[in-house]
Amino acid sequence: MVGGSYAGIRAALTRYEYPETIFAAFSSSAPVEARINMTMYWDQVYRGMVANGWTNCTQDIRAALDYIDDQLSDEETASSIKQLFFGSGAEINSNGDFTSALTGIYGFFQSYGMSGGTGGLGSFCTYLEVDPETNGSTGPDGLAPLYGGQYVAERWAQWPVFTELVNENMDTNCRSLNESAPLDCDFSKPYGDPSAISWTWQYCTEWGFYQASNDGPHALLSRYQTLEYQQEVCNRQFPSAVVKGLLPPQPLADDVNKALGGWTIRPSNVYFSGGEFDPWRTLSILSTEDIAPQGVQFSTTIPGCGVETSENTVFGYIMENSEHCFDFQSTPTSGKLSRGLFTSAMLEWLPCFGQE
């Protein structure tokens, strides 16, 4: 059984729960640990940006957000800052919904890292980090120390593809970019896509994964992106479920881990992989976060067929400078290495097929 992301969770847990049915599994980028607070998602984005030479961009984003949050704290300026970014109609949004739309700059990161084409995070940082005096790249400290957070926020708002990117992500029509449709800049609308609805139900009821702001020196989000706001999104998506008592006050993450094992599972005949900067690795069996089990060694030594590794060992591989499910992309060398490890493991395990 092969899968990445949620399918990777299913691959690992299905082998764990039904070894008589599933002989082996490839579990890529799988956050098997349920947890409400997933603010560390953004720590991985920060690490990936810094590792790829964009420390200045992280600093400018924080400076811009400090200015934006300050403007949002006053009703007289809140409407203006919302309209600065998305035009007329944006002022109707709550501070939480508005700053949620600002996270659109990170939309392609987990799939492409600092790549992602014209709407990718690398393109945004390349656009942002231009000194207006020299028209050259900024230094390591970015723009804010010289020009201030307001300047950076205004430049962010002028990124040519930003409104289009947000419209696509939020199913809106801010600034009437689609001339054949009415103006629509309401970011509070519930999801309408069936796959988005089903996934939202899963994380709102069980898995958690609330990606609120990673407050502190590495913060990349507005302070209005709180855990409480994430819960509000769930309640808003399923209002009738709240009334009927079908939606719990918060996700039942502890119950999920108690039932399924979380990141302590060690099923035999399972290969785990993850990207170095994959935000979802923070809750995977290959997590290196402070909240994860400590002293666990990640080994590429193939265990024997049907042999579970010890609690302190995981058969797995972390792909260098990679993100989510990069072993299922054809180009990265690290992905090819990861697939090769699983192939080698299968060649070793297959002779005992049917003998377990």
Residue ranges and their predicted role:
Residues 5-11, 280, 324:
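His-enriched metal-coordination microenvironments in redox/metal-binding proteins
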Residues 21-141, 145:
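A catalytic-pocket lid/entrance helix-loop region that shapes and gates access to the active site
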Residues 10-14, 37-38, 282-285:
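A short acidic (Asp/Glu
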Residues 1-3, 28:
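Short beta-strand immediately N-terminal to the catalytic nucleophile in serine-hydrolase-like folds
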Residues 103-356:
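C-terminal subdomain of alpha/beta-hydrolase-fold enzymes, centered on the catalytic histidine
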Residues 16-19, 40-45, 286-292, 333:
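Short secondary-structure boundary/capping segments
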Residues 6-19, 25, 32:
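Short glycine-enriched nucleophile-adjacent loop
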Residues 10-13, 56, 60-63, 76, ...:
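Extracytoplasmic/secreted proteins, especially bacterial periplasmic and envelope-associated proteins
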